[in-house]
A protein has these predicted regions:
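M16 family metallopeptidases and their MPP-like homologs
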Residues: 1-43, 61-71, 119-140, 150-255, ...
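Aromatic-residue-lined binding/catalytic grooves and analogous aromatic/hydrophobic interfacial grooves
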Residues: 41-46, 55
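Well-ordered, non-membrane alpha-helical segments in soluble/globular domains
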Residues: 45-49, 76-79
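A short, acidic, amphipathic alpha-helical segment used as a generic capping/interface helix at domain edges
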Residues: 47-53, 255-267
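Glycine-rich, charged/polar anion/phosphate-binding loops
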Residues: 50-53, 105-110, 126, 160-162, ...
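Glycine-rich phosphate/diphosphate-binding loops that line cofactor/substrate pockets in enzymes
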Residues: 54-61
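An aromatic/glycine/proline-enriched structural segment found at the starts
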Residues: 65-122, 127-129
Length: 275
């Protein structure tokens, strides 16, 4: 189902497109074409090697930062070791020329045929990145729809192994999904039905509280010392400062049912999904 969600949201952000091309089913097609080209044309293999070498040199020329996680008394020695290795590295500093690839942008639905008696369904709507004020309501909305409607409709009644909704701030997408699902069209109808359920039936405050607490607890979940350091480093590199996290946490705690209905109308009703 991760592949299905990736396909549906493939063109909703630059990162989503990159992930689809590099790690998704799109990459599988690329690898198939590459192998075929190499088998039919000897120069194709050398062209691949040349391209990989150019990418490697481009990485070596790029600005670098090193993250070192260790015990305090070892830090000075290990920093010296890292510096010694990189200072001795000889790098060709001539300009790096890489093949430019024209992006293929399409919002068409896709279906991939597999040898199985079950389906993996996904439906994606364009959304906002995580710093946007609507990101918090969309995060809560995903859990709210999953707990309040989708789990029952898709798993308990529909017979799928699982299903739900998720908001992805990197892909800038709000996605519905199911996995190992004996149904197809009926599941997509359930995705739509969850929207109608939220907008047109009475909602209970305790369900909202459960969705919010689930998100906040996942944010506050402790990790290992090394894991915490690594996470903090990459978060800072991408502007996810402690102040940013506090702001997001406060926004999550302040989400109301009216907020859920507002973002549902704006992002799910007034936009067409990609399936």
């Amino acid at each position: 189902h991760s592949y299905a969600m990736q396909i549906a949201s493939r063109n909703m952000s630059a990162l989503a497109k990159r992930d689809y091309d590099n790690t998704g089913l799109g990459a599988l097609n690329w690898l198939t074409r590459l192998v075929t080209n190499i088998e039919q044309d000897e120069s194709a293999y050398q062209n691949l090697i040349n391209e990989l070498q150019a990418i490697h040199r481009g990485l070596l020329l790029a600005p670098k930062q090193f993250l070192l996680v260790c015990e305090e008394h070892q830090s000075e020695h290990l920093v010296e070791e890292v510096q010694e290795v990189w200072n001795k590295l000889a790098v060709d500093r001539s300009p790096v020329l890489l093949t430019e690839v024209e992006p293929e942008v399409s919002q068409n639905d896709q279906a991939w045929l597999i040898q199985a008696n079950v389906q993996f369904c996904a439906s994606a709507y364009p959304a906002v990145e995580v710093a946007h004020a609507d990101a918090a309501p969309l995060m809560v909305l995903a859990g709210y729809l999953r707990n309040g409607f989708l789990h029952s409709a898709i798993r308990e009644k529909g017979g799928a192994y699982g299903g739900g909704a998720s908001y992805d701030g990197n892909a800038c997408a709000f996605r519905f999904y199911s996995y190992r699902d004996p149904r197809l069209a009926e599941t997509f109808a359930d995705f739509e039905a969850s929207i109608n359920w939220l907008l047109n039936t009475e909602q209970k405050p305790h369900q909202l509280e459960e969705a919010i607490l689930g998100l906040v607890s996942s944010m506050d979940k402790p990790g290992s010392p090394a894991g915490e350091a690594i996470t903090a480093c990459y978060a800072l590199l991408h502007g996810r400062t402690p102040a940013f996290r506090r702001t997001l946490r406060a926004r999550l705690l302040n989400v109301t049912l009216e907020d859920l209905k507002r973002v549902t109308q704006a992002y799910l009703v007034e936009q067409k999904p990609v399936k």
